[in-house]
UniProtKB/Swiss-Prot annotation:
Organism of origin: Ralstonia nicotianae (strain ATCC BAA-1114 / GMI1000)
Similarity comment: Belongs to the P-Pant transferase superfamily. AcpS family.
One GO CC term, this protein: cytoplasm
Record keywords: Cytoplasm, Fatty acid biosynthesis, Fatty acid metabolism, Lipid biosynthesis, Lipid metabolism, Magnesium, Metal-binding, Transferase
Protein name from the UniProt record: Holo-[acyl-carrier-protein] synthase
Chief site of localization: cytoplasm
Catalytic activity: apo-[ACP] + CoA = holo-[ACP] + adenosine 3',5'-bisphosphate + H(+)
EC number: 2.7.8.7
Length: 138
């Protein structure tokens, strides 16, 4: 399924910093950074607990940064905040979904990205591995 490592990326962010940005932007930061599926999940978590909402937002921000590093683009076109979403399978495993021109860019290079995200009281962390998909068919 996967082959050689194309790149790795990691990011850590202080959740309090995300809280400050949300206050300064009156909540618009979440709309700028999160994709549509992530935004729905964020809003549901925030409705249950402000802290859970902030932790979710922080992990997704860190995931986008980690992915941008793993694919070697940083935050430059076609890598945009909303073009990458980190969602969860029913098992809880986080998975990366791409859209738009970034999806084409990823497909052209034959990449697959693995992601891990976690948060603790003060910090959110993400680690991404971009792999070249094997050309061999099963």
């Amino acid at each position: 399924m996967s082959g050689a490592i194309y790149g790795i990326g990691t990011d850590i962010i202080q959740i309090e910093r995300v809280e400050g940005v949300m206050q300064r932007t009156h909540g618009r930061f979440a709309e700028k950074v999160l994709g549509p599926d992530e935004l729905r999940i964020y809003q549901a978590r925030k409705a249950r607990s402000e802290r859970r909402g902030l932790a979710f937002l922080a992990t997704r921000f860190a995931a986008k940064e980690a992915v941008s590093k793993a694919i070697g683009l940083g935050m430059h076109w076609p890598m945009t905040w909303r073009a990458v979403q980190t969602l969860n399978l029913p098992s809880g495993q986080p998975v990366v979904r791409y859209s738009g021109e970034l999806a084409d860019w990823i497909a052209q290079r034959g990449l697959h990205i693995q992601i891990s995200v976690t948060d603790e009281r003060d910090y959110a962390v993400a680690f991404a591995v971009a792999e070249l998909q094997s050309k061999l068919s099963a």
